[in-house]
Regions:
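Flexible, low-complexity linker and terminal segments
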Residues: 1, 10, 199-285
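Short coil/turn connectors at secondary-structure junctions
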Residues: 11, 38-42, 80-86, 108-113, ...
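Conserved thiamine diphosphate
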Residues: 131-184
Length: 285
C-alpha cells in the first residue's frame, strides 16, 4: 500500500507560502492512498504554470508538457496503455486559454482520464496578468483599467459538451477536495474538476476568505448529480453563494470502448516484430 512517504520527492517546493496549490497537492496524494493506487500504475501530466511543478512533488511517473497541451499528452498515454490511471493537471490560463480547444474535445470524446484545473483566476508564474476566469473589473498588469469581458464558465462549457463528470473544489477545504478527486478517478470517462486555488501573491480579490464566505456544498442541498439541466443552472450561480462539489456524474461509453484494437489489449503489449510499414511510407512521400 502506497504511503505519503512513498509519494514524497527530494525536490524543494518553490510555491509561495500560503499558495492554494499546497491543498491540491495534499488532496491528490491522499486520494491516491485512499484508492490504493500503486505508483507504477499512475501517470501525472502537467502544463506550464505554477501548477506544472506538481510533477516534481509527487513521486509517480510524470510528464511536464508545454503550455496548454497536457490533455494531448494524457490522451496518448491512455491510448497506449488504458490500464493506467492518468491524471492531468493544468492552470486556468494554461487550460482555458492555450488549451481551450483540447479541453472542449476531450470532454466531448469522453476520454477515460481525470483533469484537475488549478483555477486561481490570474497568471501567477508570470507575476499577475488576467486570465479567462478573471472577474470583470479585475485590475492586473495586463488590465490596468480592469478586465472588460465576462469571465469564462468552464463548468457550463463542460456540461453542454456532454461531459460525464463535472465538479468544482476549493483548495482551502482539502478533505472535501480529496473526496472529489477520489470520485473523479473512480469515474469511468472524462472527469473534470475546476479547483478554486487562491493566489496569495497576485490575486488580491479572490482570497481564501473571499471564497470561504461564499462557497457552499451541493451535496448538503440534495443536488441531483444525474440532472444535467440542474447542473447547468448551478454552474451559472455566482455572487454571494457559489456552489462546490459534484455538479454532474453520469457515465456513458468512453472513446476507448469504440476502438476494438485496444478494447481488450493495451497497445504496449501488441507485437511490433515483423511489421513492415514501407508501403505506408511510400504513399506519403
Amino acid at each position: 500500500m502506497v504511503t505519503l512517504g512513498d509519494l514524497k520527492t527530494p525536490k524543494t517546493n518553490t510555491w509561495c507560502p500560503g499558495c492554494g496549490n499546497f491543498g491540491i497537492l495534499m488532496a491528490f496524494k491522499k486520494a491516491l492512498i485512499d484508492l490504493g493506487i500503486e505508483r507504477e500504475d499512475a501517470v501525472l501530466v502537467s502544463g506550464i504554470g505554477c501548477h506544472g511543478k506538481m510533477v516534481n512533488y509527487v513521486n509517480i511517473n510524470g510528464f511536464h508538457g508545454i503550455h496548454g497541451r497536457a490533455l494531448p499528452l494524457a490522451t496518448g498515454i491512455k491510448l497506449a496503455n488504458h490500464n493506467l490511471t492518468v491524471v492531468g493537471f493544468a492552470g486556468d490560463a494554461d487550460q482555458y486559454n492555450e488549451g481551450w480547444g483540447h479541453f472542449a474535445h476531450a470532454v466531448r470524446l469522453n476520454l477515460d482520464m481525470t483533469l484537475i484545473v488549478h483555477d486561481n483566476m490570474v497568471l501567477g508564474l508570470t507575476t499577475g496578468q488576467a486570465t479567462s476566469t478573471s472577474q470583470q473589473g479585475f485590475k492586473s498588469k495586463s488590465t490596468p483599467f480592469g478586465v472588460i469581458p465576462p469571465m469564462l464558465n468552464p463548468l457550463a462549457h463542460a456540461l453542454v459538451s456532454n461531459g460525464t463528470f463535472v465538479a468544482r473544489g476549493f483548495s482551502g477545504d482539502m478533505l472535501h477536495l480529496k473526496g472529489l478527486i477520489v470520485q473523479a478517478i473512480k469515474h469511468r470517462g472524462f472527469a473534470f474538476i475546476d479547483v478554486f486555488q487562491p493566489c496569495v501573491s497576485f490575486n488580491y480579490l479572490n482570497t481564501y476568505d473571499w471564497f470561504r464566505n461564499r462557497v457552499y456544498k451541493l451535496e448538503e442541498e440534495n443536488h441531483d448529480i444525474t440532472d444535467r439541466k440542474k447542473a447547468l443552472e448551478k454552474a451559472f450561480e455566482w455572487g454571494d453563494r457559489i456552489p462546490i462539489g459534484i455538479f454532474y456524474n453520469k457515465e456513458r461509453p468512453t472513446y476507448y470502448d469504440n476502438l476494438p484494437h485496444i478494447k481488450d489489449e493495451k497497445l504496449t503489449k501488441l507485437p511490433t516484430e515483423n511489421v513492415d510499414i514501407t508501403s505506408t511510407i511510400n504513399e506519403m512521400t
